[in-house]
Amino acid sequence: MNKRDAQNISDKIVAVLKEERIKKGISQYKLAKDTGMSKSSILYIENGKQHPTLYTIILISKYLNVEIGSIISSIDNMWQ
């Protein structure tokens, strides 16, 4: 695995989390406010201008009530 592969995985994780946020009708503003993040951070992460840390991924996934394992499984299925 190289740096580009890691970035692709990060992009896919963000895509899953963004899809869940939208599906649940949660705005970027509400997500930012409720998680203590800035709206610009959420915007940059979702637009691929910033890669989230593991802490940020866990924080957002817990807020959205999305299991990390299910995210990894969906990415693993995409990867094959």
Residue ranges and their predicted role:
Residues 15-34, 59:
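Short basic helix-loop element that most often maps to the first helix and adjoining turn
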Residues 1-23:
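A short, Lys/Arg-rich alpha-helix, primarily the initiator
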Residues 36-51:
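Recognition helix of helix-turn-helix/homeodomain-like DNA-binding domains
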Residues 17, 31-32, 42-45, 71:
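Conserved hydrophobic/aromatic packing and binding residues within compact polymer-binding modules
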Residues 55-70:
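DNA major-groove recognition helix of helix-turn-helix/homeodomain DNA-binding modules
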Residues 1-8, 70-80:
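Short, charged recognition helix plus adjacent turn
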